[in-house]
Design a protein with these regions (language model features):
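Short, low-structural-confidence N-terminal segments
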Residues: 1-72, 121, 144
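Peptidyl-prolyl cis-trans isomerase
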Residues: 38, 61-154
Length: 154
């Protein structure tokens, strides 16, 4: 791991979670994945979204694990976005996005309004979740298109 990334990540850990709303530090670049920036706000929002989607609350005990999972999640998604852009693949079905959101609400046993309210309460734009789902759908479609002729089903 590069020294800059280690220092940036250490600074992030020091300043994280004192408070989400009153933290007076402006957004900072944590690192990059390819040509895509990874910002402090992206990591915080990913952690919040993971907590919302898992139905869990933040605690100091799960902080480090949550940060690791969030960083891995963002990194994977950025890699997928790079490949999607590389192959100029933008096919997805909006009905599939709606279906995935419905699965989330059913899993959490809440309605769509409550889910959107949770995002608003945590200062996360709901379109972030929609874009995350779209990226997964595009990625799955891209992988299918690239490898459909190589798969043999008996």
């Amino acid at each position: 791991m590069s020294k800059i990334f280690k220092i940036s990540f250490l600074l992030f850990l020091i300043f994280s979670f004192t408070t989400f709303k009153s933290l007076s530090i402006t957004d900072a670049l944590i690192g990059t994945v390819g040509n895509k920036p990874l910002l402090h706000s992206d990591l915080i929002n990913e952690m919040k979204m993971l907590l919302i989607l898992s139905g869990k609350n933040f605690s100091q005990e799960n902080k480090k694990e949550l940060q690791k999972v969030a960083l891995k999640s963002i990194t994977g998604r950025l890699i997928k976005e790079i490949e999607i852009e590389k192959y100029k693949f933008n096919n997805f079905n909006q009905n599939d996005v709606d279906y995935e959101i419905n699965k989330i609400t059913e899993k959490l046993n809440i309605d769509l309004g409550t889910l959107k309210g949770s995002f608003k309460t945590n200062d996360i734009n709901f379109s972030t979740l929609e874009n995350r789902i779209k990226t997964e759908l595009k990625w799955n479609g891209l992988m299918f298109n690239l490898y459909k002729n190589r798969v043999i089903v008996n």
